[in-house]
Amino acid sequence: MEDIIIGVVALAAVLLFFLYQKPKTKRYKLPPGPSPLPVIGNLLQLQKLNPQRFFAGWAKKYGPILSYRIGSRTMVVISSAELAKELLKTQDVNFADRPPHRGHEFISYGRRDMALNHYTPYYREIRKMGMNHLFSPTRVATFKHVREEEARRMMDKINKAADKSEVVDISELMLTFTNSVVCRQAFGKKYNEDGEEMKRFIKILYGTQSVLGKIFFSDFFPYCGFLDDLSGLTAYMKECFERQDTYIQEVVNETLDPKRVKPETESMIDLLMGIYKEQPFASEFTVDNVKAVILDIVVAGTDTAAAAVVWGMTYLMKYPQVLKKAQAEVREYMKEKGSTFVTEDDVKNLPYFRALVKETLRIEPVIPLLIPRACIQDTKIAGYDIPAGTTVNVNAWAVSRDEKEWGPNPDEFRPERFLEKEVDFKGTDYEFIPFGSGRRMCPGMRLGAAMLEVPYANLLLSFNFKLPNGMKPDDINMDVMTGLAMHKSQHLKLVPEKVNKY
């Protein structure tokens, strides 16, 4: 079906190209890249599977800055720490906009959110609000008990499976953990994990995430938007939005109900509705703005932490010496403390574990291709022209393997590199940018880190793991599932064994 659609796109685009093409008045010296076909550009050369590795392969051939074309759009990919710094620091303002994306526009209530909003005065106001209120250290700390409570529930499930020598699905457990935490933090709602409301929430979430990761023909072939309709993509987008909007509106209505029993800790939607009532911004802050911002929190919060822990455990299965070293540190510290559960406060006393978290985010950044930026004005990078309107991707996966920064073995999973070198993910070390950098850096970085540390550390404390059914580490599938966050394409399943906790 996809091949047929591509064929129709090509035919329709060729006809419309000759009807509407205008002569270019300016020639640019674009970065090198593969030769494009007429009209459709490099569309047929792209790969869906493991796009970060695919673009890294192109970078080896064409260099750390390359360009390609899809339809009417010029695309640029950055794959080195040096050029990432040029883009994200030196020329940050000029690359602070977002490119066209029909799904992003529709799902985010006309880009009223933080992540997908154009670079406008409203964006700057809403980002400042997010940094100072939604994601401040104080706000993140208020939900510490929620994250720890849900992590305990997750460990209890694994304990029961270990008693029966059953296989556990780490991917599924982590998604359940993040979904439960996010519902409590964002909405003040504690759902039964197997109940209908949680199933409804997950269905809505997956639909929204799916639309955000889709490619729309109309974004690249302006005269072929009808193909989004013919393929059913437009209808699917509207259906997902309808479910999403109905759910969030119900939560908003509950928040406004004066008879409602408020959660013990103010939820994020309570905070946002307070801002809606106060109207502190120069731009109007509507209910749709509330919905869009809460959507950012839900989508980012559920996806990234789960993917990170799964990738971490995957690499630990392939590097048993790292696993043993991490387990030894966590277990020795907790034995000395006399506790059987790692809290967020304990993590700061576990230097090797903190290095392990960083190495996990380095070797498999969960958003390996940072959310695309758009060039606002004509500029140059590395001597090449970058025209206004160009879409620019930073391949964080390739940047974190830049041999100039990480040495000759960047594919080796080695947490020690973060004990030997002072590098952090706060956006100022451009060889390590899992949360991005600059004006578009993820404002929820602190919350994202907190979401993954406690479950990750307690897996190391409480259990030994082995692969099921005689699998060997080399048998583990390392492919990624395409989307906003790159999950493993196949769930990670392990056999837990209880550890004697002194």
From Swiss-Prot:
One of its GO terms (biological process) is response to insect. The chain crosses the membrane at residues 1-21. GO terms for molecular function: heme binding; iron ion binding; oxidoreductase activity, acting on paired donors, with incorporation or reduction of molecular oxygen, NAD(P)H as one donor, and incorporation of one atom of oxygen. It comes from the Eukaryota. Heme binds at residue 442. GO terms for cellular component: cytosol; endoplasmic reticulum membrane. It is an enzyme of class 1 (oxidoreductase). Its cofactor is heme. InterPro entries: Cyt_P450, Cyt_P450_CS, Cyt_P450_E_grp-I, Cyt_P450_sf. Gene3D superfamilies: Cytochrome P450 (1.10.630.10). Its EC number is 1.14.14.43. PROSITE patterns: CYTOCHROME_P450. SUPFAM superfamilies: Cytochrome P450. Involved in the metabolism of aliphatic and aromatic oximes. Involved in the biosynthesis of both short-chain and long-chain aliphatic glucosinolates. Belongs to the cytochrome P450 family. This is Cytochrome P450 83A1.
